[in-house]
């Protein structure tokens, strides 16, 4: 696991985009994408770029259960507004949160992932250490599944809704086992509220109580953090290859 420290989220997006360009130059064709505030600066770099993504396939991590794609709180809507409308892909896959049989939808999504192995997976991390919507206690062997969201996740996501009561209580999420099959993982985290989760992910025991800790076992993970999110990584009793990067403006 390589840790790259950056000045702020904007610089973090630039670094992530540089990593993507390197991956594309090596033949990457399928991107695993995330939502939320952490990857927005990365998507902004993609949108500003002259690169053409029309030969790429994207597979998103998750979607709320019960929201139409036209809802401005759906992740389908988020992706269109932040990336896909400006930069069309060959094919974009997201779980169908309105599927009549959501268990069958989860199985269908696993088949999509199997047919399109992910070359470059973007992740955020929740305050409780979740990746995707894989909450604490999720089996590391889990593939795409229906999730009952924890109160801490509902509260954290309520800032995107009119009220906390409007936040969906379930989601369909790519599982940890599926995420771990990705060839390369880039995790972005910004802000003091992520510091505990980052410390646990990097230095803590590998435990289902902190889902992101499983990333210690992946061969190619790059973590991009600002100083606040990295604030608990400095310790005289812990050793880690921390890279401080300064981008040219």
From Swiss-Prot:
Catalytic reaction(s) noted: alpha-D-glucosamine 6-phosphate + H2O = beta-D-fructose 6-phosphate + NH4(+)
CDD domains: GlcN6P_deaminase
Active site feature: 62 (proton acceptor), 128 (for ring-opening step), 130 (proton acceptor), 135 (for ring-opening step)
GO molecular function annotation: glucosamine-6-phosphate deaminase activity; identical protein binding
Pfam families assigned: Glucosamine_iso (PF01182)
Annotated pathway: Amino-sugar metabolism; N-acetylneuraminate degradation; D-fructose 6-phosphate from N-acetylneuraminate: step 5/5
GO-annotated biological processes: carbohydrate metabolic process; glucosamine catabolic process; N-acetylglucosamine catabolic process; N-acetylneuraminate catabolic process
Keywords: Carbohydrate metabolism, Hydrolase
Entry keyword annotation includes Hydrolase: yes
GO cellular component entries: cytoplasm
Keyword Hydrolase: yes
InterPro entries: Glc/Gal-6P_isomerase, Glucosamine6P_isomerase, Glucosamine6P_isomerase_CS, NagB/RpiA_transferase-like
Entry EC no(s): 3.5.99.6
Entries under NCBIfam families matching the protein: nagB (TIGR00502)
General function of this protein: Catalyzes the reversible isomerization-deamination of glucosamine 6-phosphate (GlcN6P) to form fructose 6-phosphate (Fru6P) and ammonium ion.
Membership in a protein family: Belongs to the glucosamine/galactosamine-6-phosphate isomerase family. NagB subfamily.
HAMAP family, per database record: GlcN6P_deamin
Protein name stated in the entry: Glucosamine-6-phosphate deaminase
């Amino acid at each position: 696991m390589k840790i790259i420290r950056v000045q702020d989220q904007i610089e973090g997006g630039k670094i992530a985009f540089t990593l993507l360009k390197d991956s594309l130059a090596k033949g990457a064709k399928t991107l695993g994408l995330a939502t939320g505030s952490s990857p927005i600066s990365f998507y902004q770099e993609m949108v500003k770029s002259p690169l053409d993504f029309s030969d790429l396939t994207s597979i998103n991590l998750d979607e709320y259960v019960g929201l139409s794609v036209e809802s401005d709180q759906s992740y389908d809507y988020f992706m269109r507004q932040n990336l896909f409308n400006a930069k069309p892909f060959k094919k974009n896959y997201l779980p169908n949160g309105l599927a009549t049989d959501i268990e069958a939808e989860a199985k269908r999504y696993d088949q999509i992932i199997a047919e399109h192995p992910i070359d470059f997976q973007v992740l955020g991390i929740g305050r409780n250490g979740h990746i995707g919507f894989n909450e604490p206690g999720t089996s590391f062997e889990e593939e795409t599944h229906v999730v009952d969201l924890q109160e801490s996740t509902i509260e954290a996501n309520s800032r995107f809704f009119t009220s906390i009561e409007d936040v969906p209580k379930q989601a369909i999420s790519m599982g940890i086992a599926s995420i771990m099959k990705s060839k390369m993982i880039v995790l972005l985290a910004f802000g003091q509220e992520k510091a505990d989760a980052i410390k646990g992910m990097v230095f803590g025991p590998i435990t289902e109580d902190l889902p992101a800790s499983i990333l210690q076992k992946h061969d190619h993970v790059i973590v991009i953090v600002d100083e606040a999110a990295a604030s608990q990584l400095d310790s005289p009793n812990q050793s880690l290859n921390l890279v401080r990067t300064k981008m040219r403006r």
